[in-house]
């Protein structure tokens, strides 16, 4: 609280452009935070490829896919698998409920944020009318469904920026230290909603410049 109060006092003095406040994670330890919000599990992808930067592709200086209606609002789903739709495949942007995701993928899939295991209903209906019940917590996919076909790894920020400027990719972020063995690892499965080359990278809470990321292919 002292840090927050000091920061807000400096904000009133014109030293900062934003204020700070306590949130739901303020009293958690680092381990508790990882257990609550980080569901990504690293795996050896059978269909993984390496993202190649196009030779003739100019990376846009900034892009915000939210302005184009490509990204649904962010949900606070703790360590459950993220729920989102792909407007480029479906021509409509519908925010699916967590209950729909639970019923469609089952308990284990919700806990394991695996890139290549996710699939969605192409109709993107928030109700269960698009699904045929097979047994509790499992669904039979209809003929119109599509799924993630694989991923492409990006070993640097420039490659990730190249992919992100072309579409809004889903990425797996490893934000631990550059060590073979690391016991303090914070990971997450995220949707990049945009980027801006002018933003101050040195002030990021984690060094993202050389971390691995994967772009979901559909």
From Swiss-Prot:
Belongs to the peptidase C1 family. Residues 144-173, 195-218 are annotated as: Disordered. Residues 201-212 have a biased composition (Basic and acidic residues). It comes from Homo sapiens (Human). InterPro entries: Papain-like_cys_pep_sf, Prot_inhib_I29. This is Putative inactive cathepsin L-like protein CTSL3P.
């Amino acid at each position: 609280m002292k840090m927050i109060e000091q920061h807000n006092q400096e904000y009133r003095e014109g030293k900062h452009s934003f204020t700070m406040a306590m949130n739901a994670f303020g009293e958690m330890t680092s381990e508790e935070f990882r257990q609550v919000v980080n569901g990504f599990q690293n795996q050896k992808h059978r269909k993984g490829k390496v993202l190649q930067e196009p030779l003739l592709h100019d990376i846009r200086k900034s892009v915000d896919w939210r302005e184009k209606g490509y990204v649904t609002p962010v949900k606070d789903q703790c360590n459950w698998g993220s729920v989102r739709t792909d407007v480029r495949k479906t021509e409509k942007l519908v925010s699916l409920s967590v209950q729909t995701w639970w019923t469609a993928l089952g308990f284990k899939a919700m806990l394991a944020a695996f890139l290549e295991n996710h699939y969605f209903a192409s109709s993107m209906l928030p109700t269960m009318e698009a699904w045929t019940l097979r047994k509790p917590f499992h669904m039979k996919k209809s003929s119109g469904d599509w799924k993630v076909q694989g991923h492409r790894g990006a070993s640097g920020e420039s490659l990730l920026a190249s992919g992100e400027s072309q579409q809004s990719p889903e990425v797996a972020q490893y934000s631990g230290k550059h060590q073979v063995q690391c016991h303090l690892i914070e990971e997450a499965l995220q949707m990049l909603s945009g980027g801006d080359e002018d933003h101050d990278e040195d002030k990021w809470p984690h060094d993202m410049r050389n971390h691995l990321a994967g772009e979901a292919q559909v």
